[in-house]
Curated annotation (Swiss-Prot):
GO MF annotations, alphabetized: rRNA binding; structural constituent of ribosome
InterPro entries on file: Ribosomal_uS8, Ribosomal_uS8_CS, Ribosomal_uS8_sf
Keyword field contains Thylakoid: no
Name listed for the protein in its UniProt record: Small ribosomal subunit protein uS8
Function field: One of the primary rRNA binding proteins, it binds directly to 16S rRNA central domain where it helps coordinate assembly of the platform of the 30S subunit.
GO biological process assignments: translation
Assembly mode: Part of the 30S ribosomal subunit. Contacts proteins S5 and S12.
Protein family (similarity comment): Belongs to the universal ribosomal protein uS8 family.
Species of the source: Pelobacter propionicus (strain DSM 2379 / NBRC 103807 / OttBd1)
Length: 132
């Protein structure tokens, strides 16, 4: 059976692994998922990630980050734009999360970037998810 929303599946796997304090989580890989993981690492929400080749689509292994080995750095990770209802914003309408404490991840013409990078570059795009 094909997956309707692979990005939502990735975010759900990260959310579930974070709640049960797993050190790592394996996700079927894709270019977009690797780009999202890169932004999460850059913003300090995950320790690291790596792509493992399995001669099929590959596996994206995400290493989760915890505060004092008990509380997850990610409090909430939420899919915004879905296959049934895409959410696009103009450059001057890019939202903030928790008054700037969180991050909005957008898909723009320049790739997958954060809300602050989109504002600096004057770019709008599709809101993939919010993290805080």
């Amino acid at each position: 059976m094909s997956m309707t929303d692979p990005i939502a599946d990735m975010l759900t796997r990260i959310r579930n692994a974070n709640m049960v304090k797993h050190q790592k989580v394996d996700i079927p890989s894709s270019t977009m998922k690797v780009n999202i993981a890169s932004v999460l690492k850059q913003e300090g929400y995950i320790k690291n990630y790596k792509v493992i080749s399995d001669n099929l689509q590959g596996i994206l292994r995400v290493y989760l980050k915890y505060i004092d080995d008990k509380d997850g750095v990610i409090n909430e990770i939420k899919r915004i734009s879905k296959p049934g209802g895409r959410v696009y914003v103009k450059a001057d309408e890019v939202p903030t999360v928790k008054s700037g404490l969180g991050v909005v991840i957008l898909s723009t013409s320049k790739g997958i970037i954060t809300d602050s990078a989109a504002r600096k570059a004057g770019l709008g795009g599709e809101i993939i998810c919010t993290v805080w």
